[in-house]
Amino acid sequence: MRKLLIILLCSPIIVFGQNLAVGDTYEGGIIFYLDGNGGGLIAAPTDQATVNDFPDWGCIGTAISGADGLTLGTGAQNTIDIENGCTTSGTAADICSNLVLDGFSDWFLPSIGELEIMYLNIGTGSNIGNFVNTKYWSSTEKDETYAWSWEFSSGYQDYNSKTSNKYVRAIRAFSNITNINKQQISIEKKIIKIFDVFGRESNNKNQPLFYFYDDGSVEKKIIIE
């Protein structure tokens, strides 16, 4: 079974005399990850594609070589590989790749691991990133038919047809991302149902929920806000 490696690091760091922390506005967006060595990831302050103009992943039927990076630090290369392997304009990756915001033009579509960290650090609680409770595309391809997305309403990954239309939030990196401590979560399985302790279907936060997957496994999670 494939695994997704992630990290949560919220400690302030010093960059060129500045004391930076997750949630700060910096270089065109909102910091959602710091590596402790002067590097980090920034989310654009608003969605690049919304309900009135939201794209598909693109190029269904084609497996994009190299666009399967799962972890922190892989979204940029995923986006490059998608742009090279899928010439369709207006796709999720294409929108991010062509974004120019506050003078920065190095934006990209986040990997599924980067999306999860973005959700956990600036998407829950006070929702600093002002995300919508819906699915956002990642740059992580599953195969020629499906790509991974992150559900911001309940906090889990899913894979969807590349023809599906979803929200998009671009990100960019500052300095070189290093010192990535990792933990494992499952990626190669799909949620079928979510139940509360009384057996009712629920996506409510701040309570124990049971996630039932298509491989027969069950996980108990609590998403705190």
Regions found by a protein language model. Name each.
Residues 3-17:
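Sec-dependent N-terminal signal peptides
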Residues 18-38, 200:
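N-terminal module-boundary/linker segments of secreted carbohydrate-active enzymes
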Residues 24, 28, 35, 89-91, ...:
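C-terminal, surface-exposed recognition/capping segments
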Residues 35-108, 112-113, 117-121:
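Short aromatic-cysteine micro-motif
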Residues 175-200:
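Residue-level detector of functionally pivotal "anchor" positions at catalytic/ligand-binding pockets or at interdomain
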Residues 178-179, 206, 218-221:
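Short, compositionally biased serine/threonine- and acidic-rich segments at solvent-exposed termini, linkers
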Residues 210-225:
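C-terminal tail/sorting-segment detector
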